[in-house]
Amino acid sequence: MAETAEDLAEKKKKRTFRKFTYRGVDLDQLLDMNMDQ
């Protein structure tokens, strides 16, 4: 489990984005919708 600070920062970033919601819609879903349109 030897992780560099960069690896941890990347994980934290992904975790934050995964939790981020806009009006109850997951950020991932918003991004997918924007790409589809």
UniProtKB/Swiss-Prot annotation:
GO terms for cellular component: ribonucleoprotein complex; ribosome. It comes from the Eukaryota. The keyword Iron does not apply. GO terms for biological process: translation. Signal peptide: none annotated. One of its GO terms (molecular function) is structural constituent of ribosome. Keywords: Ribonucleoprotein, Ribosomal protein. Belongs to the universal ribosomal protein uS19 family. This is Small ribosomal subunit protein uS19. The lineage of its organism: Eukaryota, Metazoa, Spiralia, Lophotrochozoa, Mollusca.
